[in-house]
Amino acid sequence: MAVGKEILTKIRSVQNTQKITKAMQMVSTSKMRKTQERMRLARPYAEKVRMVMSHLAQTNTDHGIPLLESHREIRRVGFILITSDKGLCGGLNANVLKKFLAQVQEYRNQGIEEEIVCLGSKGLMACQSIGLNVVASAVNLGDTPKMEMLLGPLTELFQRYEKHEIDKIHLVYSGFVNTMRQEPRMEVLLPIGENVIGDSAPKPPFSWEYRYEPTALAVLEYLVRRYLESVVYQALSDNMASEQAARMVAMKAATDNAGNAIKELRLVYNKSRQAAITTELSEIVAGAAAV
């Protein structure tokens, strides 16, 4: 019954793995609910900042703020690449990286260079492994990242845009659609689109003018930064919700696969045990007949 003992050892090993994946599935389910709530709570702030900024930009067209410049010749682009810090979340990071690398290659074919800010260790490791130009990064952000952890890398990129060292900035992340579906997204963060500050932007539900201190332009310049930061944080929240959803689904699949493997191993064990018993009975019968 040496074979039977080996099968039992495999069954116990798979059962232990199944317990781990089941626990990870439950943890991911809990974390996903929390990240979804954080994502929902961040939206009203971002929307209010966008609305006030849009109103100010439309009433102060000669603002001269570099972050609001809309037409530039593209010579160098920046990317804010958001991925997870941990794995075991299916093809989430692979799909985002595939979309990101395709865009990088497209720019390189046009002779346009890139500068990358990585938020999340998986994206950072991928970029470093293929020799991309990473200018700043933030990793080990945890389950509840603080905006202060992102300010350094983001400020670096925004300042380079203000100095005309970068002409366009893309935001790349995994967007949360629902529990079963997450999609890689790439958005133009800078220059800010017409749908945010142009004539096509939603109009505020009022017609009166505020008095701004110290000046409307100073407030506008401040709000532009806050708006950009809120968009990035919203994308990070989306990515974290996507990560937990993808990990929950992946761990459920792993748990189910472990259950199927255990059933198959038990079937093999029972068959081998049945064969061994049949052999022993045959030997006993043969021995009795010989006597």
From Swiss-Prot:
Quaternary form? F-type ATPases have 2 components, CF(1) - the catalytic core - and CF(0) - the membrane proton channel. CF(1) has five subunits: alpha(3), beta(3), gamma(1), delta(1), epsilon(1). CF(0) has three main subunits: a, b and c.
Entry function = Produces ATP from ADP in the presence of a proton gradient across the membrane. The gamma chain is believed to be important in regulating ATPase activity and the flow of protons through the CF(0) complex.
Write down the SUPFAM superfamilies for this protein, in alphabetical order: ATP synthase (F1-ATPase), gamma subunit
PROSITE patterns found in the cross-reference section: ATPASE_GAMMA (PS00153)
Q: What is this protein called?
A: ATP synthase gamma chain
Q: Where does it reside? A: Cell inner membrane
Which molecular-function annotations from GO does this UniProt entry contain?
ATP binding; proton-transporting ATP synthase activity, rotational mechanism
One Pfam entry for this protein is ATP-synt
| Gene name per UniProt | atpG
Entry's Gene Ontology BP terms? proton motive force-driven plasma membrane ATP synthesis
Which membrane topology describes this protein? Peripheral membrane protein
Q: Does Cell inner membrane show up as a keyword for this record?
A: yes
InterPro entries per record:
ATP_synth_F1_ATPase_gsu, ATP_synth_F1_gsu, ATP_synth_F1_gsu_CS
Q: Which NCBIfam families does the annotation name?
A: ATPsyn_F1gamma, PRK05621.1-1
Answer whether the UniProt record assigns the keyword Hydrolase to this protein.
no
Can you tell me where the transmembrane regions are?
none
State the family it belongs to: Belongs to the ATPase gamma chain family.
GO cellular component terms? plasma membrane; proton-transporting ATP synthase complex
The UniProt keyword set, sorted, is: ATP synthesis, Cell inner membrane, Cell membrane, CF(1), Hydrogen ion transport, Ion transport, Membrane, Transport
